[in-house]
Amino acid sequence: DLNNETIEDWNDHFKVNLMSGVELSKHFLPEMIKRDWGRIIFISSECATLVPSDLLSYSVSKASINVFSSGLAKLTKGTNVTVNTIVPGSTLSEGSKKFLEETALREKKTKDQVEKKFFNDVRDSSLLSRFLNVTEVANTILYISSPLASGTNGASIRVDGGSMGSIL
């Protein structure tokens, strides 16, 4: 929560999640526009929309990626350069694996039991009711980085197992 996150936590999240992308975009976008081709892909998070109260700095930094990406895409108007954001849901990353292992050990449960409880209690909006595997997210990144995605620009593409429910 807000009282447990330091200013350093906030600065770190913004440095890693937003400012690294700002710096890379400033460096590479002009050449992409000059060549009239390129792909800039940001990785956001479902936490940018489904904001957990214990992850405020992380969530706000991820939401800022969505805003930056949308604005940056407008600078590519009339070119073959695209700027998009991938918005993954709960993914079985190294951090998630560690969470499952530590929670299972602490609560004397199996990792499967912890995962089931997480999707029943915390992320009950997920239609998959399981963690995404990294390959599911990577496949979307592969597509959006390819020439096949030439018609997609300025989009936030959800790979969330249905957790953010939307008709758009």
Predicted regions and their residues:
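Short C-terminal tail/terminal secondary-structure segment
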Residues: 50, 141-142, 148, 153-168
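Active-site helix of classical SDR
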Residues: 25, 61
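Catalytic Tyr-X3-Lys loop
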Residues: 3-23, 37, 41, 65, ...
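Active-site loop immediately N-terminal to the catalytic Tyr-X3-Lys motif
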Residues: 2-3, 50-56, 78, 129, ...
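Short, small/polar-rich loop/turn modules that mediate ligand/substrate recognition or access, typified
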Residues: 77, 82, 152-154
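Alpha-helical segment proximal to the catalytic Tyr-Lys
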Residues: 30, 74-75, 150
